[in-house]
């Protein structure tokens, strides 16, 4: 067999490289010189069609736990599934019948895709869904957050439904843009066949679909601002304990209660954005730099959480106007309760010298001092919080142009709240948020036992105005029980 001649020119080296041939007859210096001489092709941006770009801008993640909940929705899903199977048989895609486990997985996949596509189309006709197609991602070990049927056959099901006209795919790709190499996820939207099928059910609404019991409602995750970018926002798998089982049972009770609640908007009110009144299943999310069930735990994912304040004020519960109640100076009061000290009278963000300064600045600084972990990370530190909180930096010049500086503000807060000074800069804020979420859940369950629907918005509870006094009393009782301090409850 003739011996290959070693490349001696940049053109020869480029030819060898294009054919995957390794250069074995050059010294390292000669090899490097030839590589430098060969011009490197510049990556060209991938020109995505305008409709694909728009689809990605409007996309939300696919929700695999959405299910049909009414006879109408179940009938629609069954019709679509039968048509997909018929299309598969007509094309002769499969030579053998699926095994029972594979058949169940295929049916669950089609059901979830149809349910979420229909739900998205009814709630926001211009919206789309992002879906995974990467084999490595779909082949990863399943945890408590994953749908059992999402596996390596998922892209094949997407393609089959796309071929049958029930969905349109805008496939993801690597893209060279302003910030270098970036990837875009695949997005899908309802196809013409699905739109035509939906047209046969004029009474179909988003309320015909809901999240099934398979979705985890007790979520443990890394914080979104974690120092390690690989961990930011990632969910953490965990083993169940009596505590997690109890919390999940509480969320099931509340979610079932909200699912049957009479929630609506005031007649004549035009919301800023479409409101999906069927989005009522909430989860408790425990998110922190070092995630545990003692940090965080607020409730998320319902439609009233993401509503603008103006739209939320137009909510009706049982056709009744509502009022929002929240705790005043909650974290500072919890700090006094933990220290076993009496809580000062009045607004804790306006004690002494603090009353002369803008409350909207003092409040986030005081809470940030409780969140700050400087004395945990450096036990020898005498202070912490070296920068203004990010949420007030932009408005600091407008609202307080003559401020004395962060160091002075910190010192005055420490002086005015001397009994709890030892708790600043020790990262207790997320612990207090966990206590606060415990109080909120306890109040919601107590309201339910009275037949009253309460809707949580972080540290606030929305109730019918006629039940304001009862809700306020319950909030005071539960706060005293959990935080060991007296609460201040007021209208938000």
What positions do the PLM features span?
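Short amphipathic alpha-helical interaction segments
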Residues: 146-164
């Amino acid at each position: 067999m003739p011996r290959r001649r070693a490349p001696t020119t940049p053109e020869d080296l480029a030819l060898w490289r294009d054919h995957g041939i390794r250069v074995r007859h050059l010294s390292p210096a000669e090899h490097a010189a030839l590589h430098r001489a060969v011009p490197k092709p510049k990556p060209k941006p991938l020109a995505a069609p305008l409709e694909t770009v728009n689809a990605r801008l409007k996309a939300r993640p696919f929700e695999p736990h959405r299910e049909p909940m009414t006879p109408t929705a179940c009938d629609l899903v069954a019709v679509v599934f039968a048509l997909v199977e018929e299309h598969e048989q007509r094309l002769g895609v499969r030579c053998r019948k699926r095994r029972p486990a594979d058949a169940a997985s295929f049916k669950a996949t089609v059901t979830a895709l149809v349910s979420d596509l229909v739900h998205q189309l009814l709630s926001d006709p211009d919206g789309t869904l992002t879906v995974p197609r990467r084999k490595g991602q779909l082949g990863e070990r399943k945890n408590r957050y994953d749908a059992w049927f999402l596996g390596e056959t998922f892209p094949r099901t997407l393609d089959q439904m796309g071929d049958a006209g029930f969905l349109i795919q805008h496939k993801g790709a690597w893209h060279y843009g302003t910030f270098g190499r970036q990837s875009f996820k695949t997005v899908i939207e309802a196809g013409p066949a699905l739109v035509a099928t939906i047209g046969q059910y004029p009474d179909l609404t988003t309320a015909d679909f809901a999240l099934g019991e398979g979705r985890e409602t007790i979520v443990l995750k890394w914080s979104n601002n974690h120092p390690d970018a690989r961990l930011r926002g990632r969910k953490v798998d965990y083993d169940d304990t009596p505590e997690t089982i109890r919390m999940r049972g509480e969320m099931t009770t509340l979610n079932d209660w909200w699912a049957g609640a009479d929630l609506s908007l005031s007649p004549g009110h035009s919301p800023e954005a479409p409101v999906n009144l069927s989005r009522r299943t909430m989860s408790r999310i425990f998110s922190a730099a070092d995630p545990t069930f003692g940090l965080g735990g607020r409730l998320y994912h319902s439609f009233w959480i993401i509503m603008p304040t103006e739209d939320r004020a137009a909510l009706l519960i049982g056709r009744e106007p509502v009022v929002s109640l929240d705790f005043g100076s909650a974290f500072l009061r919890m700090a006094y309760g933990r220290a076993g000290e009496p809580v000062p009278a009045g607004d804790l963000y306006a004690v002494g010298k603090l009353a002369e300064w803008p409350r909207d600045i003092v409040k986030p600084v005081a809470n940030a001092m409780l969140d700050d972990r400087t004395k945990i990370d450096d036990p020898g530190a005498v202070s912490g919080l070296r920068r203004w909180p990010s949420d007030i930096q932009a408005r600091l010049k407008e609202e307080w142009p003559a401020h004395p500086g962060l160091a002075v503000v910190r010192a005055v807060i420490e002086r005015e709240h001397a009994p709890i000074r030892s708790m600043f800069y020790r990262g207790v804020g997320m612990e207090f948020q966990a206590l606060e979420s415990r109080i909120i859940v306890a109040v919601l369950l107590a309201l339910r036992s009275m037949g009253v629907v309460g809707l949580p918005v972080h540290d606030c509870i929305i109730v019918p105005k006629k039940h304001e006094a009862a809700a306020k009393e319950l909030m005071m009782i539960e706060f005293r029980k959990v935080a060991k301090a007296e609460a201040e409850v007021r209208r938000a």
